[in-house]
Amino acid sequence: MNCGPAFSISQSTFYIGVSSGNFTAGYLVAVNATTLAPILPHVHLIDPNTGQNATIPDDSSAAPTVGPDGDVYYGVFETACCSNHDRGWLLHFNSALTASKLPGAFGWDTTASVVAKAIVASYHGGSSYLLLTKYNNYKSTGGNGQNYVAITDPNTPMTDPVTGVSVMNVVMEQIGRTADGPPTGAVREWCINSSAIDPVTKSAIVNSEDGTNYRWDFTTNTLSQQMSLSPGVGEAYTPTVIGPDGTVYAINDAVLYAIGQ
């Protein structure tokens, strides 16, 4: 499988997903960062809609994310296509992996980005931080093709309109800019597995399948800047990164771009 580790707040533990093969069941495992000895218990990854095994595809690049409070988030695929429109689930656990918490409604091939509460002015809830993931709704697997990126509250529930499962509440969302109908309203999907968060400008840098790199401004909830990188092709989900000097790094059509002034 294709998964990187995430370290605990203390750096003494790292978390990683494991499976026995492509599209098989899997576990989230905690490991001693010094000795590499497994730390029990491991978590059996379960689809919150079916109550059965979630699956871990080899072509998913999802990696765990550790929140500032130590909670662990990991994206998985559904038990089988297409009970959640191939969106998967963002599973949510405490740091000891002994308690399952509120899941997110999108987890396929995504690594959640942590968003500081202070940079989302419109948020007045009780969580100390928020999460950003892509929130596509694939038209080829039962969805309406209205593909979003979303900021979610990891502790406040809403009812998922597709499955009826209680999931993380969507605080803010931004639909893709380039039409891709039919059906009417469908847009090109967001091609990211994680997003760079810019606390200085209170924004995120996100890649789209339309070949464009966008800045999503959290204050205005608009795509405030953009840079065309390619004509737009179906491609792998890739991350964006911001360097110490403010340069943005993004991959589009298998080319790494450095974007800056």
What label would you give each PLM region?
Residues 1-2, 6-261:
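Extracytoplasmic/lumenal domain signature
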